[in-house]
A protein has these predicted regions:
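Helix-breaking motifs and short loop linkers at transmembrane-helix boundaries and internal kinks
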Residues: 50, 82, 103-109, 247, ...
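Conserved MFS/SLC helix-loop-helix module at the cytosolic interface between two early adjacent transmembrane helices
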Residues: 69-105
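Helix-to-loop junctions at the C-terminal end of transmembrane segments
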Residues: 70-83, 267-279, 364
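Primarily marks hydrophobic transmembrane alpha-helices of the MFS/SLC 12-helix fold
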Residues: 84-87, 110, 280-284
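Paired small-residue
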Residues: 93, 97, 108-117, 306-314
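Helix-loop-helix hairpin linking two adjacent transmembrane segments in secondary transporters
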Residues: 107-109, 137-195
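Cytoplasmic helix-loop-helix junction between adjacent transmembrane helices
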Residues: 113-152
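C-terminal transmembrane helical hairpin of 12-TM major facilitator-type secondary transporters
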Residues: 281-326
Length: 394
């Protein structure tokens, strides 16, 4: 394991506020928003590039697979390098990747851009998890960590609807130009507000996997894998589902996704507050919401436009709390090795996004839109069962 060196008095003065933590939360928001943006622009992007929606969905898979590998070994890859410089560098990579996506004339260029994005996302996720306690005074360490992960949660539910709104108003490429500009801003912000974050020691690849021997950590990661895999099997293709099965127009889809996003932000903080008292209860509430919404959509005959929109809000409320609750579960299971469990959690989370979008793409191309919602419901139900029978601590 790596250990952080004590901050200098100058560093402490700079980190008394939560501004550096907010800057990192902005970075996690941007990397996750960038990863998932194809969800909200899937139909126009596929049409513009002359590919099927299933193939377009692979852009999510590519990013998730690369990020999963990189996040798991990120601390070992950067060794003793100052985390401040590493974060700035890979936010610049994110800026370039989104610009290249906006310029992509075909799927090959798009795939290359998404590989770059996956590297950036993996590095930021893999390092950000352990920075909360380093950047805040002891009494605010938990709040700092929650804020950092709130960037992930909020992006998961709000980034895509905002991007869909921009794309429907100005074209799908404009959404990626906006993300590129935001990445450039975040890079500068990190340079201004983030103090040096040196480390002592070096992590050998594979050492952190020993934390999986803790049954609480393993259960928490299993819950994450199941619910996230199911979620992205369905949510990646939620736009064509809403258009074909619920009869929503593109404008109404954008509005429904925006409502989903607002609900998700609320869910993030409500479930996050509950997670501080009981990680298990928080997980069951979050995952239970996903189970209820996806099951109703999957087996409700497509549902009418209004009821489908309401169910999407319930989905957002539940999934908005998944990141903070499952990460809190894994941290509570092994408080002495939070950095190791967080890195593995991030890797598993991203791998599940990748696998989920692949499964969803295969299902939607072979069995249609309703079938992907059934996959989503099944994955979430399995996660809920694990949460019922397992405990964060022995």
């Amino acid at each position: 394991m790596e250990t952080f060196t004590p901050a200098s008095s100058g560093d402490k003065a700079r980190t008394r506020s939560l501004l550096p933590v907010v800057a990192i939360a902005l970075c996690t928001f941007l990397v996750v928003s960038s990863e998932m943006m194809p969800v909200g622009v899937l139909t126009p992007m596929a049409g513009s590039l002359g590919i099927s929606e299933g193939v377009a969905g692979l852009s999510l898979t590519i990013t998730g697979l690369v990020a999963a590998v990189v996040a798991t070994v990120a601390p070992a890859l950067v060794g003793r390098a100052d985390r401040r410089g590493v974060l700035v560098l890979f936010m610049c990579v994110l800026t370039a990747a989104n610009a290249l996506t906006a310029l992509a004339p075909d799927f090959l260029v798009l795939a290359g851009a998404r590989v770059l994005l996956g590297v950036s996302m993996g590095m930021v996720w893999g390092l950000a998890a352990g920075l909360g306690s380093r950047l805040a005074e002891p009494g605010r360490a938990a709040l700092a960590t929650t804020l950092i992960f709130s960037g992930v949660s909020i992006a998961s539910v709000l980034g895509v609807p905002l991007g869909t709104f921009v794309a429907d108003s100005f074209g799908w490429r404009s959404a990626f130009w906006a993300l590129s500009a935001a990445g450039a801003f975040a890079s500068v912000l990190l340079l201004v507000v983030l103090p040096p974050v040196p480390v002592a020691g070096r992590v050998r690849p594979g050492v952190g996997f020993g934390v999986l021997r803790n049954p609480g950590v393993s259960a928490g990661i299993a819950i994450s894998v199941l619910v996230v895999l199911g979620h992205f099997a369905g949510y990646t293709y939620v736009r064509p589902f809403l258009e074909s099965e619920a009869g929503l127009s593109p404008a109404l889809v954008a509005a429904a996704l925006l409502a989903y996003g607002v609900a998700g932000v609320l869910g993030n903080f409500v479930v996050g507050s509950l997670a501080g008292k009981s990680a298990r209860a928080a997980v069951m509430v979050a995952v239970g919401g996903v189970v209820a919404a996806t099951s109703a959509l999957a087996f409700g005959g497509g549902a009418a436009a209004l009821s489908a929109s309401v169910l999407l809000v319930v989905w957002g409320l539940g999934y908005g709390g998944v990141s903070v609750s499952t990460q809190t579960w894994t941290a509570a299971a092994d408080p002495e090795r939070v950095e190791a469990s967080s890195a593995l959690w991030a890797g598993a989370f991203n791998a599940s996004i990748a696998v989920g979008s692949v499964v969803g793409g295969a299902v939607i191309d072979g069995a249609g839109e309703t079938a992907v919602m059934r996959v989503a419901a099944f994955g979430a139900l399995c996660a809920f069962v694990v949460a019922v029978v397992a405990r964060p601590r022995r």
